[in-house]
Amino acid sequence: MERKNSSRESPRRLSAKVGKGTEMKKVARQLGMAAAESDKDSGFSDGSSECLSSAEQMESEDMLSALGWSREDRPRQNSKTAKNAFPTLSPMVVMKNVLVKQGSSSSQLQSWTVQPSFEVISAQPQLLFLHPPVPSPVSPCHTGEKKSDSRNYLPILNSYTKIAPHPGKRGLSVGPEEKGTSGVQKKICTERLGPSLSSNEPTKAGAVPSSPSTPAPPSAKLAEDSALQGVPSLVAGGSPQTLQPVSSSHVAKAPSLTFASPASPVCASDSTLHGLESNSPLSPLSANYSSPLWAAEHLCRSPDIFSEQRQSKHRRFQNTLVVLHKSGLLEITLKTKELIRQNQATQVELDQLKEQTQLFIEATKSRAPQAWAKLQASLTPGSSNTGSDLEAFSDHPDI
């Protein structure tokens, strides 16, 4: 019916429609040029839209409408960019004599294909406005910081303190500046310990003084190492500057401190601990030297020449002793050892008391003189009171 009505129209109306068609073609050309310029500015060019003719575009629109696909299924950014490019024009879609009307701004969230409103156009459309596709901007990905290499992270090694590091490994972490300062400290310690060592040595009347090129004795060398280790003053109330070697007479005045030969530092440490545990009264002079630090220093000042391996073991033992003393573990260990010794002695006394109680029960049950004699023999190493009680028991077996 629409085609019959269109054929019966007057030629004036047809000429007016032709004029309108030419005007629409001009407007379409202007819009195409503006869209091309906007595509060039945005860096995107749609080659397919330039090559296809209007008839091919209409066919493609027919196929898309048959499949139920709409232009508004594209991302919303395309419509926003199209509105920004043509703020005065409103976008529309024409599909074969059908104009899809847009809804209000509140219905932008809904798709046009759900409930569209159509308007039938009587004439063949000459204007087709398509939304230019714009690629979505790539959001910069925020890369996090690179994690540290798990192979270099060793939590077990970093959790515990090094009590006695090996001397060879200690020299690797020392910088050149620290080496220079340690050399100066060694020189100062040698100058301070030199006169004190020479004053204690017996000198003869006709003895020739030693030349400056004579190497220092090993005891002085070990004293330098102990000074570098940060060993505090060993004499009560003294300072590191007034530190002097201990002579053999001082050791003789301390009977509770017994030392083994310098060749066995482990035995010497055990004897030192046993000497500290003993409760025998010490002289005031020996009380000053009863600390484990003094014992380690005395071992380091021994006149015997150590080999390199023994010296390294000695230094490690001294480092361990100093660290244990500063952390308080040494005192805890000594107290624990003393408590263990007292516990063992108490356990022995309890065993003896159990045995004597068993003998007393047997003697009271049997009332035999042999049982009382056996009980008396078991109580003989006891006190005099127990002996008198035992005699009373033997005199009165009926008790």
Curated annotation (Swiss-Prot):
Keyword Phosphoprotein set for record: yes
Residues recorded with modification Phosphoserine: 213
InterPro entries: CIPC
Segments forming a coiled coil: 333-359
Subcellular location: Nucleus; Cytoplasm, Cytosol
UniProtKB keywords: Biological rhythms, Coiled coil, Cytoplasm, Nucleus, Phosphoprotein, Repressor, Transcription, Transcription regulation
Pfam families linked: CiPC
GO biological process, one term: negative regulation of DNA-templated transcription
Region of interest (Disordered), ranges: 1-85, 159-224, 378-399
Positions with biased composition (Polar residues): 378-388
GO cellular component: cytosol; nucleus
Top-level lineage group: Eukaryota
Biased composition (Basic and acidic residues): 1-12
Name assigned to this protein: CLOCK-interacting pacemaker
Organism this protein belongs to: Pongo abelii
Gene, per the UniProt record: CIPC
